[in-house]
């Protein structure tokens, strides 16, 4: 392994078995059914909806944030996703407005030189780690990274979700800034369902060794070929192995290696 995206590392940490299914075995999720009836009929897949929101926010002027008019938004999104429904468009518009009308957006608008969708790359243990940042501000000594989330909170606290599901991503974002010369890196998560409940963590140069150690441990496990299912609603959603070679949440007390043996047998 010589190159990994932060999303690949995060996927491995979330469920190494799903990582194997997607990144090693080459399994692909089943196509999203748009004709299943009920409320989901014709609806965008959650990842498509999230992509539309992120692409629209990338077009927003961060120094004077304003959501596009409804007709303009609909025309743009239909160009990307012709199957989008009116309900989808309404949800997308609400998410974009949630950022533009938030206190965080006002704070970001005052940061000179703030830019959307910035690439990054750095090396750890001979592996190039790369990815993109939704929003980056860097003035030399200080840096701020903003990551938008369109996840459904389902009553959960945003800080709890970040701690449980985005630790690796947060560490990678902080390292990207600190490795680029910042002495302080603030990583901010904004769940657009609750735009004022931002989750902010600040890292300093003194944290670099700890962050690198955690990232190195993940890379070492990937290199070591440890692939075991760790089912959860978040990890299993959309997994191509689910109900094919893995029982997912139904695994219960199954031996840790049982699903791995089943997948290996398909090779």
Each PLM stretch: what is its role?
Residues 35-125, 266:
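A non-catalytic, helix-rich entry segment at domain boundaries
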Residues 1-67, 143:
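C-terminal RecA-like lobe
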Residues 47, 120-180:
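Non-catalytic protein-protein interaction segments used by genome-maintenance enzymes to assemble
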């Amino acid at each position: 392994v010589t190159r990994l995206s932060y999303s690949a590392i995060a996927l491995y940490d979330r469920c190494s078995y799903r990582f194997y299914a997607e990144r090693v075995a080459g399994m692909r999720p089943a196509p999203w059914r748009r004709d299943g009836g009920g409320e989901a009929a014709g609806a965008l897949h959650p990842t498509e909806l999230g992509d539309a929101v992120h692409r629209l926010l990338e077009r927003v002027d961060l120094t004077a944030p304003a959501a596009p008019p409804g007709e303009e938004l609909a025309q743009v999104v239909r160009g990307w996703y012709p199957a989008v429904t009116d309900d989808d468009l309404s949800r997308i518009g609400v998410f974009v407005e949630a950022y533009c009308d938030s206190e965080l957006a006002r704070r970001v608008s005052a940061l000179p030189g703030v830019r959307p969708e910035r690439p990054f790359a750095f090396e750890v243990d001979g592996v190039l780690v790369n990815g993109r940042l939704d929003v980056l501000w860097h003035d030399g000594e200080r840096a701020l990274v903003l990551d938008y989330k369109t996840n459904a909170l389902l009553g959960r606290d945003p800080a709890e979700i970040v701690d449980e599901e985005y630790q690796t991503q947060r560490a990678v974002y902080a390292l990207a800034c600190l490795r680029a010369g910042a002495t302080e890196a603030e990583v901010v998560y904004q769940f657009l369902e609750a735009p004022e409940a931002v989750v902010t963590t600040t890292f300093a140069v003194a944290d670099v060794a700890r962050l690198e150690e955690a990232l190195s441990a993940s890379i070492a496990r990937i290199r070591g070929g440890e692939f075991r299912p760790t089912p959860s609603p978040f990890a299993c959603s959309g997994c191509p192995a689910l109900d094919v070679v893995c029982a997912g949440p139904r695994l219960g007390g199954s031996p840790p290696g049982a699903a791995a043996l089943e997948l290996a047998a398909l090779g």
